[in-house]
Amino acid sequence: MAWRFELLNKPYGGITEGPVWDGEALYFTHISNHRIMRYDPVSGAIIQAREGTNHTNGLCHDAQGRTYGCCSGGRSIIRFESDGTTTTIADRVDGQKLNTPNDLATDLKGRIWFTNPWNAVNIDPSEVEELDNRSVLRADPQPDG
């Protein structure tokens, strides 16, 4: 089977990542400019959907349609709220800071699975790696929210 490729827009002069489809549009991150972009396949328009994302790369949606991101600059997993704020879901494991989360997925139980490599490019140079592993982790929702 042959595939045809389409360039959506000119190169961004930085890394793009985290494409996720919401049923109407494609969202992706422009990591170095701290933005989430939205591509509308009907009009062909690409607009800035959110700014100030602190090196967020991987994106996903849960069963309720909420958007989550791996905020490598904040060393956390966050949820982007509809009012423009963010909620930190996880930023530590056993009291130690996450490394630099990269990609994530949610499952039907509402759990968030994510990769946790060390990528010093996306954080302040004074930061240090606290976890002694680069792994896949799972965050389980707790009764207290």
Model-identified regions with their sequence ranges:
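Sequence-structural signature of mature extracellular/luminal beta-sheet repeat domains
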Residues: 1-145
